[in-house]
Amino acid sequence: ILEEVFGPILGKLLGIAYAWFFITLAALNLQDLCDFAKITVMTETPRLVLALLCVLVAVYAVRHGLKVVTQYGTLFTFVEFAIVLVTIILLSNQMDFQNFLPLFAQPVKNYLHGTHLILTVPFGELVVFLMCAPCVRLSSKDATKYWFGGAAMGMVVLLSVQLRDISILGDTISMFTLPGLVVLRLVNLGQTLSRMEILFAAALMMLLYFKISVLCYASTIT
């Protein structure tokens, strides 16, 4: 498509740029996954072993097509949503809404900078799904609905997590590398829900692996 629209030379250059973007983004997410696993659940496992295992499984999934890559994505997405909702309910008695005050105390440029980062990093990466569009049999109306619906769901979850963490940790949130895990460790209902952060960590690592697989798939068809 790029070559048909922009010509053979410029189209190839844009294709290379897209492939480089997807590969670089996959590498950054792979680093995040390995760092997260080392900090939380696999502290004794060498980082190289974690990276190799993730890459091999991602390549295996990509080799068998987009359907294999996305089959488990929905399951772990809803698991993550459920964990966020349950923790908000269980930790509601520990939330202090005074932690949100004072409102709008920062300069306007700080809010603009933060908004730019959010729109660029998490939501700017949605461009990768354009590479998967030819594999999805949907009308343009349905595709638009699912596209913006998925983005809206992601925005709601990210906002809910941030509001939950700030309301509980307050100013101390800047002291923690993984404030979400710190908050989840506060959930303690006897021995039934005393280690919910392990479930959260496992689901988050699977979602990162899903993201890496999609990026690898996009880079191979670019």
Across the structure, where does each feature detected by a protein language model lie?
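Membrane-interface interhelical connector segments
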Residues: 168-197
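Small-residue-rich segments of transmembrane alpha-helices in multi-pass membrane proteins
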Residues: 8-17, 76-91, 151-160
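Membrane-interface helix termini and inter-helical loops of multi-pass transporters
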Residues: 32-42, 95-109
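Membrane helical hairpin/interfacial module
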Residues: 1-47, 53-56
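Membrane-interface helix-boundary motifs at transmembrane edges
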Residues: 2-6, 66-72, 135-147, 222
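Membrane-interface loop-to-helix entry segments
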Residues: 33, 48, 61-91
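Hydrophobic, membrane-embedded alpha-helices of multi-pass small-molecule transporters
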Residues: 18-22, 26, 50-55, 63, ...
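C-terminal hydrophobic structural anchor segments
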Residues: 213-222
